Amino acid sequence: MPGMVLFGRRWSLASDDLVFPGSFELFLRVLWWIVSLTLYLTHRRRLDCPGGVLLSTYLIVLLVLLAVIICTVLAIVCVSMRGTICNPGPRKSMSKLLYIRLALFLPEMVWASLGAAWVAKGIQCDRTVVIGIIATVIVSWIVIAATMVTIIFVFDPLGGKMAPYPPCIPEHLDSNSSNRLLTGLKTAAKSVWETRVQFCCCCVGQDDNTRVAFSSTADLFSTYFSDTDLVPSDIAAGFTLLHQQQDNISHSREPPEVVTHTPGQPQETELDAEVENCHHYMPFAAAAYGWPLYIYRNPFTGLCRIGGDCCRARDIEYDAVEGDQHNCHFASILKTTGLQYRDFIHISFHDKVYELPFIVVLDHRKESVVVAVRGTMSLQDVLTDLSAESETLELGIELQDCVAHKGIAQAARYIHRRLVNDGILSQAFSVAPEYQLVLVGHSLGAGAAALLAIMLRGAYPQVRAYAFSPPRGLLSKSLYEYSKDFVVSLILGMDVIPRLSVTNMEDLKRRILRVIANCNKPKYKILLHGCWYGLFGGSPDNFPTELDEGTQGALTQPLLGEQTLLTRYSPGYCSSDSPLDSPTKYPTLYPPGRIIHLEEEGGSGRFGCCSAAQYRARWAHEAEFSKILIGPKMLIDHMPDVMIRALDRVLADRTACVSCPGQGGSSVP
């Protein structure tokens, strides 16, 4: 931090990012130089063959060129190790060294081309020497190609637009010119992000919904990154420091007092009943993912189990299946739920932006009509997730501020139209009129199921929804309170998705800036220690962060320090209305319903692969998920199969200890 300025533009590469790639190149070049020197010294007396003078000259010049490159790369690595993330002063000579290093590519390319031309002439010399020359030519071009790929990756399309402007634009321009300039920069940033999103999702169709999703996603990213000059390695270092800081705080904090029951809060028996319901309905949410999740959960036997059904010819039994040409999804759903053919009302695997797959089945054990919505599993689903603007819902209920996540609300409306207008629910209740409507889903599907329950509650007052790992940024405060009567959310451990919202991402950005500003260690040490700590553990106290007196004074006010550092060290980036010091354009949204948190108690290894973990179920408040936690299980805990195993474990433990007093967790209103 900040990104380097080379050739008059900013690049997505900091001057302290070259320790690891430089060390790797240094190792490769030294090894290359030793091999070339050995080859020359061993075979120099055999180079009296036709064309041997050319090969001898090639090796001598190559050795000299490699020596110069090695010295330059060594200097780059040494300079890159100096200073800290927010103190690039000791690395001010880095740009000159990089200019020298890039200039050395020209003679290297010329010499590699000459070597290839000379070898192509069919020089009649010792075969070992010729093979060695061919190897050096190949390695030269591999290094050059790798460098070109790296340049493409660190190229910042906005670097040329932002770098020439002074750091405080409003002081140099009148208000109208300043506003026009900032508007132009924001438009350019959004255009660049939209191009990136379209490139990443090039296989997604180009209908109206997709174009709207592209624009919404680009707007989200351009707004989020508009006021920072962070490069990707800065974010990785910030995650590492936050992980250790978070563990340090949790180790020093006293264990929370367990409250089994207070007046007006849910009884422990209700918690047991809801955990059992979650255990029952989670397989339906998992089944909505179809055969990919089934194969993932059963890697050795899954294909054999559903293979026969995949190859079976479609007959009348499959009339309710939509978008499953080879019946593999249907076969996996049958295996996952254990239901019969006659229990399925409708299965849709139609998948577009704002249009999610879902299944409708009859659950005779719980006497319910279950609608299971699939979570994120395609690029279309990702675009739905990232359409994070808020949208007002017309629900016909006496509530103010009925606002929800736009993408998920659109998906819920689509399923609502299908269920109601296409008569799918009417068909289900004509078969089982006394059954209760239950909506379930995981991840994105959990958010859609919760919103769908809100939309259907007027027609089905007894509707229930079970949202497994729902996104946090879903409902406004009023809808969150309203949904508590009929929605239960289940969150496992450190799962990042139930903590993920635009406001929480803003908070994470502030915390990253603060912890980077506080740290006086070079980036390479932060990343090395972070990898060791993440893999093997250790004490976070062994990696202190300190501040000098001047910076400490600047950081006495919240966010002032990192904001000062940004304006001080980011000449190319400027924002007069930075999201860091102004209200976010995205309102605060909340997860749906009452929340059950499955907390890990037993040790299962840092990645959950060493032994079976022990979990404790308890009622939790949404405020407990108002910060994103950094840890090795923040993604693992979101996987459906991990949640199924955790529920199996919780239910088994509760069944075994049903007579033990004091079991269970705290209750939160």
Swiss-Prot record:
User: Which GO cellular component term is one of those annotated?
Assistant: nucleoplasm
Positions of the catalytic residues: S443, D495
The cross-references to PROSITE patterns, in alphabetical order and at most eight, read: LIPASE_SER
Q: Which residues lie on this side of the membrane: Cytoplasmic?
A: 1-17, 80-102, 150-669
How would you summarize where this protein is expressed among tissues?
Expressed in liver and immune cells such as macrophages and microglias. In embryonic brains present in axonal tracts, while in adults localizes to dendritic fields, correlating with the developmental change in requirement for 2-AG synthesis from the pre- to the postsynaptic compartment (at protein level).
User: Which superkingdom?
Assistant: Eukaryota
Q: What is the name listed in the Swiss-Prot or TrEMBL entry for this protein?
A: Diacylglycerol lipase-beta
The species this protein belongs to is Mus musculus (Mouse)
Query: Transmembrane ranges?
Result: 18-38, 59-79, 103-123, 129-149
Sites where Phosphoserine occurs are at S570, S578, S582
In the UniProt record, the gene name given for this protein reads: Daglb
Organism phylogeny? Eukaryota, Metazoa, Chordata, Craniata, Vertebrata
